[in-house]
Amino acid sequence: MSIKSGEAHTLDERFDRIVSIGMFEHVGVKNDREYFTIARRCLNDNGLFVPHTISGNITGNHTNAWIDRYIFPNSVIPSAAQVSQAVEGQFVIEDWHNFGADYARTLMAWRANFDAAWPRLSSRYDERFRRMWHFYLDSTCANFETRGLHVWQLVLSPGGVRGGYVAPR
């Protein structure tokens, strides 16, 4: 196993497996298709690409103004239509797993860890930051609980897995 970190468009290697965690929502709508094109170029013919992304129910090219300003500048939460359009003609969708309902618990665990660490952090961060971080975690948790946001993990193959892909769940 090798782990590569850096600018994907400069890679000139091929891999059996590529995993991309939390990247797609940050490439920008105009780069959606290129993101998958680069993955395809770097993947062996019998390889698998596993993109993991936060996602939403509505197609758009913007995000919440507060999130854009304070948390994830220039991010866009992709819809199923946007993902499908970017993948079309490049990959076979072998599996599309939505585990967003579980993510609310993750956010609340982060909040609990943050609160437990606050006595050590408070010398570096002010009360305004603490309130903003709580707002981010709590509001995002609510979006996952009400199913407005999701976490998707896809398994994509260049030409289809012979005999079909079996998801290990």
Predicted regions and their residues:
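Conserved SAM-binding strand-loop segment of SAM-dependent methyltransferases
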Residues: 1-8
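Conserved Rossmann-like nucleotide-binding pocket used by diverse enzymes
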Residues: 4, 19, 50
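A short acidic, Gly/Pro-enriched loop at the edge of an enzyme's catalytic core
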Residues: 9-19
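Active-site micro-motifs of SAM-dependent methyltransferase domains
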Residues: 10, 25, 56
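A short SAM/SAH-binding and catalytic strip from SAM-dependent methyltransferases
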Residues: 17-30
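A short glycine-rich, Lys/Arg-flanked "PGG" loop and its adjoining helix->strand segment in the class I
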Residues: 33-48
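Substrate-binding/catalytic lobe of Class I Rossmann-like enzymes that use SAM or dcSAM, i.e.
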Residues: 54-169
